[in-house]
UniProtKB/Swiss-Prot annotation:
One Pfam family matching this protein: dUTPase
Gene: dut
Protein name: Deoxyuridine 5'-triphosphate nucleotidohydrolase
Catalytic activity of the protein: dUTP + H2O = dUMP + diphosphate + H(+)
UniProt-listed HAMAP family: dUTPase_bact (MF_00116)
One GO MF term attached to the UniProt entry: magnesium ion binding
Biological processes, Gene Ontology terms: dUMP biosynthetic process; dUTP catabolic process
Record: residues binding substrate: 68-70, 81, 85-87, 95
Keyword ATP-binding: no
Pathway terms, separated by semicolons: Pyrimidine metabolism; dUMP biosynthesis; dUMP from dCTP (dUTP route): step 2/2
TM annotation in the entry: none
UniProt record similarity statement: Belongs to the dUTPase family.
Documented EC number(s): 3.6.1.23
Organism annotation: Methylibium petroleiphilum (strain ATCC BAA-1232 / LMG 22953 / PM1)
Alphabetic keyword roster: Hydrolase, Magnesium, Metal-binding, Nucleotide metabolism
């Protein structure tokens, strides 16, 4: 298992470190490090601190911040940037952009689980300029080219 360095920026978060809920979990819950409840009106976006910083350190890894499915489905709370990418060399605070795309106001409570952190492998590519590509079955077929329903 890979070890990731975590820096606790707020002492309240020392007992709230991201952890896998089950042996098969891919995501680690991130919590809102707030002093008081935060009201998100419909259409409003707020940047919410997690009270943590991470340093992945391994260029073969990155992290993505993803929405929690229950918050999105039940309350319309998703990420303002849709997906957050944390590069392996980033060492700053983890922040979550929460967007209320729902029709009702939503209150984010202190220490509420607001997003998930998933560690993913990264392959860095190098690019080579070519005049043409080798033939493939699909060719330049784009949207809708592989069939319908």
């Amino acid at each position: 298992m890979t070890t990731i360095d975590v820096k606790v920026l707020d002492p309240r978060m020392a007992d709230q470190l991201p952890a896998y809920a089950t042996p098969g979990s891919a995501g680690l819950d991130l919590r809102a490090c707030l002093d008081a409840p935060l009201l998100l009106e419909p259409g409003q976006t707020q940047l919410i601190p997690t009270g943590l910083s991470i340093h992945i350190g391994d260029p073969g890894l990155a992290a993505v911040i993803l929405p929690r499915s229950g918050l999105g489905h039940k309350h319309g709370i998703v990420l303002g940037n849709l997906v957050g990418l944390i590069d392996s060399d980033y060492q700053g605070p983890l922040m979550v952009s929460c967007w209320n795309r729902g029709l009702a106001a939503f209150t984010v409570q202190p220490l509420e689980r607001i997003a998930q952190l998933v560690i993913v492998p990264v392959v860095q590519a190098s690019f080579r300029v070519v005049d043409d590509f080798g033939a493939s079955e699909r060719g330049e077929g784009g949207f809708g080219s592989t069939g319908q329903r």
